Amino acid sequence: MAPVAMILHSLQLLQDQSFKDFGTLTVLFNPDEETGSSGSKKVIAELARQHDYVFSYEPPDKDAVTVATNGINGLLLDVKGKSSHAGSAPEAGRNAAIELAHQLLQLKDLGDPGKGTTVNWTLVKGGEKRNIIPSSASAEADMRYSDPSESDRVLADGQRIVKKTLVDGTEVTLRMEKGRPPLARNPGSEQLAKTAQTLYEKIGRSIEPIAMRFGTDAGYAYVPGSAKPAVLETMGVVGAGLHADDEYIELSSIAPRLYLTVALITRLSQDEAP
């Protein structure tokens, strides 16, 4: 709940200073973030497009602000074969597990290291009993990417590759479940990070702009090709061990990180003033 506390205390500090020059300041708390924000992603996107700046409060593991995050997709690979008795008539079957293994080898290089795209096959299922040739098999992959165009590229390449089968009579399909989009590197976020660095230096501290390899709700707020809103992620307190029993925050980071939110709102409001 540290992000919630950070936001509420930042608002209190602004109120204590009687600062109201920000135009419109909107706060959104969504309880479904851990499950993909399926119920709130539309609201996030709609509200973001009504504002000039968006701050998201994931916790950084060091004094940093994030200017880019990865997008997350899932790839679903399904093979349909034909079952048969493995002892008396194996030749009558069409082994979906063998075909799945063939496809996984073909698809192992779908990623693109040069673009930061990774595709890792992480779940495999096939067969029901040891004495039955499996009639179906499936696999799922985790895809991470920073270039928005990579979703279409990976799916197109994958669907082309799976047309080459090994086991005659099997059918193979590949589809994609789209998850969080990336917060791609963009001038607006980069400039916002520079402003954060300048403000942080005023209290004798330094802050680093970084790119994260995992996905966050900042991707829903980002509008590709548009200067606004400028989005900045990891505005929360510094900490680590997410979801673990030993998860923690650095208490010494609370005050400076509160300062950063308040100082950014104050500075950006002045910059936007007519």
Task: Locate the predicted segments by residue.
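Short, conserved micro-motifs enriched in small and acidic residues
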Residues: 1-5, 90-97, 248-255
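Acidic/histidine-rich catalytic neighborhood of metal-dependent amide-processing enzymes
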Residues: 1-70, 269, 273-274
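Short glycine/serine- and small hydrophobic-enriched flexible loop segments
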Residues: 8-16, 102-108, 263-266
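Short helix-capping segments at alpha-helix termini
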Residues: 17-21, 164-169, 202-203
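Midchain, well-structured core segments that form catalytic/ion-binding scaffolds
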Residues: 33-34, 41-187
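Active-site-adjacent substrate-binding region
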Residues: 98, 102-112, 120, 179-232
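Zn-dependent metallopeptidase/amidohydrolase metal-coordination segment
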Residues: 124, 205-272
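Generic hydrophobic alpha-helical scaffold/packing signal
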Residues: 142, 155, 159-162, 197, ...
